[in-house]
């Protein structure tokens, strides 16, 4: 069985498929239908412990616990709910680390924003997640749990998933792809409703489409690439790791992903007051991304207390959007959610660490 492992060698079942659980149950000396029962309790009912799965023989449940086998659920240590019902969870792992997950509701959908690592090594200057560096990557069950925890907290089934929380997904790509498989097959979330965001990892992005097809059978999730600048020089000022990934090479790799998958690429662009938000920046960005199927998603900067960046005023944001639109670039402006509850990536975790 291709299972995930908790720190210390304990085994977590969350992330395993129905077929894997059936095979594992048989190997445990149980009938195959016990695996199907486990699957239902893991994913449909969201069980947090073997004690809750009363359909399983008590002797087997006790044996699993004694051998250190777990469901793999995380512990909620903090919850913040904004006036618009955006919900941020701070979840604790078994080794005492904390990660953030956000549920963003609208009338029609519930989008959940997931973390892929504890902290982040990319050190983007405007992002709270990278301030403390990287502690470790998350296991598959720790990624999947975030969806279950938000479903439980918000009493609503998630419809869309974005890997835009803590961490760089492409630096934990095997666990991320395994989680996508689980979310798709075991939780019924279509790949087309899943987005993987990256600032660009030169040894992984060029082969992402092929790797996804090998692991998932197809590559239908959306790739979102965080540009945040219209040229290499400014991008390196904002994203230190960009020095290893030339702008044109990054765009070529995005074109390759489009060619292989047929899925348009989304370009994320965070607007920083008086730094990358002027009309000339919009014109240069339009020249860069025009010519292949893509979409630009503008994001107004969410202030971090100890940084000197500013959030642009609404008029500047609209002027930037209008320049792109006039030049034939598909563009949208992401609405900021949860500003009153530190729901920007990494902020609640930093606040918890400072007070706790």
From Swiss-Prot:
<feature type="binding site">
    <location>
        <begin position="226"/>
        <end position="228"/>
    </location>
    <ligand>
        <name>S-adenosyl-L-methionine</name>
    </ligand>
</feature>
<keyword id="KW-0479">Metal-binding</keyword>
<dbReference type="GO" id="GO:0002935">
    <property type="term" value="F:tRNA (adenine(37)-C2)-methyltransferase activity"/>
</dbReference>
<keyword id="KW-0808">Transferase</keyword>
<dbReference type="InterPro" id="IPR027492">
    <property type="entry name" value="RNA_MTrfase_RlmN"/>
</dbReference>
<protein>
    <recommendedName>
        <fullName>Probable dual-specificity RNA methyltransferase RlmN</fullName>
        <ecNumber>2.1.1.192</ecNumber>
    </recommendedName>
</protein>
<feature type="binding site">
    <location>
        <position position="197"/>
    </location>
    <ligand>
        <name>S-adenosyl-L-methionine</name>
    </ligand>
</feature>
<keyword id="KW-0963">Cytoplasm</keyword>
<dbReference type="GO" id="GO:0030488">
    <property type="term" value="P:tRNA methylation"/>
</dbReference>
<dbReference type="GO" id="GO:0019843">
    <property type="term" value="F:rRNA binding"/>
</dbReference>
<dbReference type="InterPro" id="IPR007197">
    <property type="entry name" value="rSAM"/>
</dbReference>
<dbReference type="GO" id="GO:0051539">
    <property type="term" value="F:4 iron, 4 sulfur cluster binding"/>
</dbReference>
<keyword id="KW-0949">S-adenosyl-L-methionine</keyword>
<dbReference type="GO" id="GO:0070475">
    <property type="term" value="P:rRNA base methylation"/>
</dbReference>
<dbReference type="GO" id="GO:0070040">
    <property type="term" value="F:rRNA (adenine(2503)-C2-)-methyltransferase activity"/>
</dbReference>
<feature type="binding site">
    <location>
        <begin position="167"/>
        <end position="168"/>
    </location>
    <ligand>
        <name>S-adenosyl-L-methionine</name>
    </ligand>
</feature>
<comment type="similarity">
    <text>Belongs to the radical SAM superfamily. RlmN family.</text>
</comment>
<dbReference type="InterPro" id="IPR004383">
    <property type="entry name" value="rRNA_lsu_MTrfase_RlmN/Cfr"/>
</dbReference>
<dbReference type="InterPro" id="IPR040072">
    <property type="entry name" value="Methyltransferase_A"/>
</dbReference>
<feature type="binding site">
    <location>
        <position position="302"/>
    </location>
    <ligand>
        <name>S-adenosyl-L-methionine</name>
    </ligand>
</feature>
<dbReference type="GO" id="GO:0000049">
    <property type="term" value="F:tRNA binding"/>
</dbReference>
<feature type="binding site">
    <location>
        <position position="124"/>
    </location>
    <ligand>
        <name>[4Fe-4S] cluster</name>
    </ligand>
</feature>
<keyword id="KW-0408">Iron</keyword>
<keyword id="KW-0004">4Fe-4S</keyword>
<dbReference type="InterPro" id="IPR013785">
    <property type="entry name" value="Aldolase_TIM"/>
</dbReference>
<keyword id="KW-0411">Iron-sulfur</keyword>
<feature type="disulfide bond" description="(transient)">
    <location>
        <begin position="113"/>
        <end position="345"/>
    </location>
</feature>
<feature type="binding site">
    <location>
        <position position="120"/>
    </location>
    <ligand>
        <name>[4Fe-4S] cluster</name>
    </ligand>
</feature>
<dbReference type="GO" id="GO:0046872">
    <property type="term" value="F:metal ion binding"/>
</dbReference>
<dbReference type="Pfam" id="PF04055">
    <property type="entry name" value="Radical_SAM"/>
</dbReference>
<feature type="active site" description="Proton acceptor">
    <location>
        <position position="100"/>
    </location>
</feature>
<feature type="binding site">
    <location>
        <position position="127"/>
    </location>
    <ligand>
        <name>[4Fe-4S] cluster</name>
    </ligand>
</feature>
<dbReference type="InterPro" id="IPR048641">
    <property type="entry name" value="RlmN_N"/>
</dbReference>
<keyword id="KW-1015">Disulfide bond</keyword>
<keyword id="KW-0819">tRNA processing</keyword>
<feature type="active site" description="S-methylcysteine intermediate">
    <location>
        <position position="345"/>
    </location>
</feature>
<comment type="function">
    <text>Specifically methylates position 2 of adenine 2503 in 23S rRNA and position 2 of adenine 37 in tRNAs.</text>
</comment>
<dbReference type="Pfam" id="PF21016">
    <property type="entry name" value="RlmN_N"/>
</dbReference>
<keyword id="KW-0698">rRNA processing</keyword>
<dbReference type="GO" id="GO:0005737">
    <property type="term" value="C:cytoplasm"/>
</dbReference>
<keyword id="KW-0489">Methyltransferase</keyword>
<feature type="domain" description="Radical SAM core">
    <location>
        <begin position="106"/>
        <end position="340"/>
    </location>
</feature>
């Amino acid at each position: 069985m291709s299972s995930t492992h908790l720190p210390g060698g304990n085994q977590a079942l969350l992330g395993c498929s129905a077929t894997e659980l059936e095979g594992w149950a048989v190997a445990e000396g149980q009938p195959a239908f016990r695996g199907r029962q486990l699957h239902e309790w893991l994913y449909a009912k969201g069980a947090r412990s073997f004690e809750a799965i009363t359909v399983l023989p008590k002797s087997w449940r006790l044996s699993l616990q004694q051998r250190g086998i777990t469901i793999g659920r995380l512990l909620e240590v903090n919850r913040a709910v904004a006036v618009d019902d955006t919900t941020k969870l701070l979840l604790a792992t078994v080794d005492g680390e904390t990660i953030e997950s956000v549920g963003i509701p609208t009338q029609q959908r519930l989008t959940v924003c997931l973390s892929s690592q504890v902290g982040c090594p990319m050190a983007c200057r405007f992002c709270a997640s990278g301030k403390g560096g990287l502690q470790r990557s998350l296991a598959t069950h720790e990624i999947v749990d975030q969806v279950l925890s938000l479903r439980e907290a918000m009493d609503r089934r998630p419809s869309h998933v974005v890997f835009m929380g803590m961490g760089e997904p492409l630096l934990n790509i095997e666990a991320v792809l395994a989680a996508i498989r689980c979310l798709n097959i075991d939780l019924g979330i279509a790949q087309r409703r899943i987005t993987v965001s990256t600032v660009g990892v030169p040894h992984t992005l060029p082969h992402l489409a092929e790797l996804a097809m090998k692991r998932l059978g197809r590559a239908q999730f959306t790739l979102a690439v965080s540009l945040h600048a219209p040229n290499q020089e400014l991008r390196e000022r904002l994203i230190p790791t960009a020095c290893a990934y030339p702008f044109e090479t990054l765009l070529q790799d995005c074109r390759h992903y489009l060619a292989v998958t047929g899925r348009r690429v989304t370009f994320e662009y965070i607007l920083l007051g008086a730094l990358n938000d002027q009309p000339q920046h919009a014109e240069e960005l339009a020249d860069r991304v025009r010519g292949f199927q893509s979409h630009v998603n503008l994001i107004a900067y969410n202030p971090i207390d100890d940084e000197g960046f500013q959030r642009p005023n609404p008029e500047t944001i609209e002027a930037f959007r209008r320049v792109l639109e006039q030049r034939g670039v598909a563009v949208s402006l992401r609405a900021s959610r949860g500003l009153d509850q530190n729901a920007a990536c990494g902020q609640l975790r930093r606040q918890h660490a400072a007070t706790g």
